[in-house]
Amino acid sequence: MEKEVVLMKGNEAIAHAAIRCGCDGYFGYPITPQSEVIETLAELKPWETTGMQVVQAESELASIYMVYGAAGAGKRAMTSSSSPGVALMQEGITYMAGAEVPGVIVNVQRGGPGLGTIQPSQGDYNQATRGGGNGDYKVIVLAPSSVQEMADFVDLAFELAFKYRNPAMILSDGVIGQMMEKVVLPPFKPRRTDDEVVKECPWASTGKPKNRERVVITSLELKPEIMEQRNLALQEKYRKIQENEVRFEEQQMTDAEYAIVAFGSAARLSEKAIEVAREQGIKVGLFRPITLFPFPTTQIAELAKTKKGILVVEINAGQMVQDVRLAVNGAIPVEQFGRLGGIVPEPEEIVQALKDKLF
């Protein structure tokens, strides 16, 4: 069967992939620079073809709780927003993490803090990887650096979310969301039937069929001893995720004396910066974390054994650099370069930062 290749925006790829990967429901609210997700879904009308429901909620708060409710019934449910909207969703996300309910959240980041700007940013790294709500919890975080990965990561996010009964986030940004590239769309995957949901998700609140105890979805537990055990179980789950689900990519690292560590659109910019640097005789390669949680700590620690220094490039004031420094543990210099206010760094600026900070 011939592959279907189309030209589209990253946001549009999210919408097409959601329909094709068996998503049962999308609940969202428009906000720049991710509005094309819900706009595309409205145009495609998947409720008439696959049965996928698309709801424009009254707010981001309502959106995440609709996801919580649908996912609590074992359905593949998702939402998308941009930075201020995802900030509003944090209460619902921590509820889902505490109740061990899977769901997918897409964050097409823009500049902040506060209302900030509609221009691109990577300023939500800490919020995504540390858990922006209350309590000790983690969200699985995937960081696409192309429109193709925007499409591919929707199904991957659902697979990981249901495998570990945990919210999963696709942490994109305004560059990837708005840029247009060729995409190979994934094949259609049928939505699960109600019987399949009952069989595959015994934890889900699907009513009370015969020979089954009732299921209550909640993050609340008033007995400290039981709550401690639930928290310890969560931490054990996060350890398993860290052990089994790390994903990363390396480019031109074989002969590299220096490394750039970057994710998302910053990694795309760094690819060009590496070309420029190598033309000037600087041997540098790229290490791109694809999962931000679980973070490739061990792999970066190994990387540090063979490099003279690392430059972390991110479109923020310096967030992922903290995790890189923890991984390197002082073995080699680790510096950071970024732009703020919605300004995207030029490749030449990255090369100059490499020279200024590590040479």
Positions of predicted regions on the chain:
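N-terminal glycine-rich anion-binding loops that anchor highly charged ligand groups
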Residues: 6-43
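Structural signature of the thiamine diphosphate
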Residues: 139-195, 349-359
